[in-house]
Curated annotation (Swiss-Prot):
HAMAP family: UPF0251. Belongs to the UPF0251 family. InterPro entries: UPF0251, WH-like_DNA-bd_sf. It holds the Pfam family DUF134. This is UPF0251 protein VV2_0946.
């Protein structure tokens, strides 16, 4: 039985709900869901270009956990780009974690 997920600090939510290949209806394509913590890890590491330790501290997780999250996120994005799948993103109705 896996351990319960610890709360993570999420700095922002996306402005879009999904990305998909152009010209193909979304209902005809397989979907991969990007979790809120995975999107935040991508934002911190790739957009803000923070080191893993800084990004992990910002999210309230260990550096090892951050490394696992960013690896999972990059894998999902790469699969969607290479295999032409729909990438669904967390939406505004999900709870946004507040900084303590």
């Amino acid at each position: 039985m896996p351990r319960p997920k610890k709360p993570r600090t999420i700095g922002c939510l996306p402005k879009a709900s999904c990305f998909k290949p152009n010209g193909i209806p979304a209902h005809n394509l397989p979907r991969i869901a990007l979790e809120a913590d995975e999107l935040e890890a991508l934002r911190l590491a790739d957009v803000l270009q923070l080191h893993q330790l800084e990004a992990a501290q910002s999210m309230g997780v260990s550096r090892q956990t951050f490394g696992n999250i960013i690896k999972r996120a990059r894998n999902k994005v790469a699969l969607c780009l290479v295999e032409g799948k729909v990438l669904t993103l967390p939406n505004q109705s999900q709870d946004k974690e507040k900084e303590a």
